[in-house]
Amino acid sequence: MLFMVIERFKNKDPKPIGERFKRSGRMMPDGVTYHASWIDPVEARCFQVMAAEDIDALKGWAARWADLADFEIVPVLSSHQYWAEQELQKNRSG
């Protein structure tokens, strides 16, 4: 399952996150896969696409960073997957 993780850096300061990342890496538990990330320097946010079997694995990972950022974790589908599922539902009901 894919998730969009939105990190909001505490005090709008990404430096502590960067310093910990350099020391300790991403600190991901087994079963969590990092895909890509983008930084919004104006609003001090990071957007990450990650995969996991369920949201609980990601919540455990976010807890390791909670002293430096607030997290919003949103389950997402690719556009292709979403529209394919819509088509399947349409065919089943109709």
What kind of region is each of these model predictions?
Residues L68-S79:
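Conserved short beta-strand edge segments in small beta-sheet-based binding/regulatory domains
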Residues M1-H35, D40-R45, E53-A57, L77-G94:
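Short S/T/G/P-rich N-terminal loop/turn motif that feeds into the first structured element of a domain
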Residues V32, A66-A69:
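Structural motif
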Residues A51-A52, R64:
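Conserved catalytic core of Hanks-type protein kinase domains
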Residues A57-W65:
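Short, electropositive alpha-helical surface patch
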